[in-house]
A protein has these predicted regions:
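Short, Lys/Arg-enriched N-terminal segments with co-localized hydrophobic residues
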Residues: 1-3
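An N-cap/entry alpha-helix motif that binds or orients negatively charged groups
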Residues: 5-55, 119-124
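Short secondary-structure transition/capping segments
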Residues: 17, 101-106, 190-191
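Active-site cofactor/substrate anionic-group-binding motifs, chiefly glycine-
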Residues: 59-63, 67, 71-73, 77-98
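Conserved alpha/beta-domain cores
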Residues: 62, 70-72, 83, 122-232
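Short, conserved acidic/polar surface loops in the N-terminal third of protein domains
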Residues: 78-82, 100-107, 156-159
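Non-cysteine beta-strand/loop elements that form the S-adenosyl-L-methionine
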Residues: 91-103, 171-182
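A gly/proline- and charged-residue-enriched helix-loop-helix capping module
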Residues: 93-143
Length: 232
């Protein structure tokens, strides 16, 4: 697998711009769904049952603590494909109530010297309803966390309504939530870390959760650059 990637797939993908290569990778994953035994082969290679890695956190039993963070499966369409690679959970999104295009292109840049990518997509996604339709159609075979955010066109004073809307639509179809208030690529989003905005968002989600029979953990995605004083 490594040899094939390094000497065949990587040169092909690197001949395209990063976003096109990203989309081609997902097209490849879709293709593998129709290849007999492809999923079984991937699970055999990457998915290992290791009892010592199992964790009980937030009332959820995780097969292992290594998950796929939000930002890759933006629309909640590849959670089972990603599970084949052995992830203990998959975070979908960020998802917003309405579809949005994200930032203008180009918005993804390779940094070969650091073997890294700079991501400035800006929460492009097809919207919560699209994700819900897919979750209804394809039952998750992995723990799914929904990363939710507000639409870029929504002013911060109305942000809590966006989070409420996304939360309510997704509640019955995912295992946990991540409230995204820290994407630096979206103008004004990090301002939601201010306690006045944040307390309104969290209070509304906690109140809304009380109406459901099943408990869903709510996690908060904050900026990694906040000081301990700011976090307090």
């Amino acid at each position: 697998i490594y040899y094939m990637y390094k000497h065949i797939l990587k040169p092909i993908l690197f001949s395209f711009n990063p976003e096109t290569a990203h989309n081609m990778t997902f097209a490849g994953l879709k293709f593998l769904r129709y290849v007999p035994f492809a999923g079984s082969i991937l699970r055999g290679l990457y998915k290992k049952d290791t009892p010592s890695l199992e964790k009980e956190v937030f009332g959820i039993h995780f097969p292992n603590p290594v998950g796929l963070a939000g930002g890759l499966d933006k629309n909640g369409e590849f959670y089972n494909d990603m599970a084949n690679f052995g992830f203990g959970f998959v975070e979908i999104g960020s998802l917003t109530p309405q579809p949005q295009d994200g930032n203008p292109k180009p918005r993804c840049f390779r940094v070969p010297g650091d073997k890294a990518l700079i991501n400035r997509f800006g929460i492009n996604n097809k919207g919560v309803k699209n994700a819900v339709e897919h979750l209804k159609k394809v039952r998750p075979e992995v723990i799914v966390a929904a990363n939710i955010s507000k639409n870029s066109t929504s002013v911060n004073e109305d942000a809590a309504k966006d989070y409420e809307s996304a939360f309510a639509l997704l509640y019955d179809f995912v295992d946990m939530f991540v409230v995204n208030i820290s994407c630096p690529n979206v103008v004004g989003l990090t301002a939601l870390q201010d306690m006045n905005f944040l307390s309104d968002i969290i209070d509304r989600l906690l109140s809304l959760r009380m109406y459901y029979d099943e408990y869903r953990p709510i996690l908060l995605k904050v900026s990694p650059d906040l000081s301990h004083e700011q976090l307090d």
